[in-house]
């Protein structure tokens, strides 16, 4: 299964990496690698992320790479990452 990011999710991920790198560049690199590895598992196990506790009736799941939450949905043979939020942010309903 292919993994893709929406334009907004890609922007949020890059913003998170820049924020982490502003304090400690090596942490940003490690975070990126950990996120890529965690999201990569979704290729084989797309339902392995947890259902969003805030919106259990919506078709979205999440993978947590602390302190960020990667929100996704499965569309046919694609895992579509739709958002990347810091865990301290308030979550609005996904679009």
Indicate residue ranges for each PLM-predicted region:
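Basic, Lys/Arg-enriched alpha-helical interface segments
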Residues: 2-60, 78, 94
């Amino acid at each position: 299964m292919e993994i893709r990011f929406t334009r907004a999710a890609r922007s949020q991920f890059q913003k998170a990496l820049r924020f982490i790198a502003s304090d400690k560049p090596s942490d940003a690199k490690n975070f990126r690698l950990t996120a890529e590895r965690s999201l990569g598992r979704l290729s084989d196990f797309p339902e392995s992320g947890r259902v969003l506790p805030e919106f259990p009736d919506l078709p979205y799941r999440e993978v947590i790479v602390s302190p960020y939450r990667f929100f996704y949905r499965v569309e046919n043979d694609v895992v579509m990452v739709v958002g990347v939020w810091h865990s301290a942010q308030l979550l609005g309903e996904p679009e």
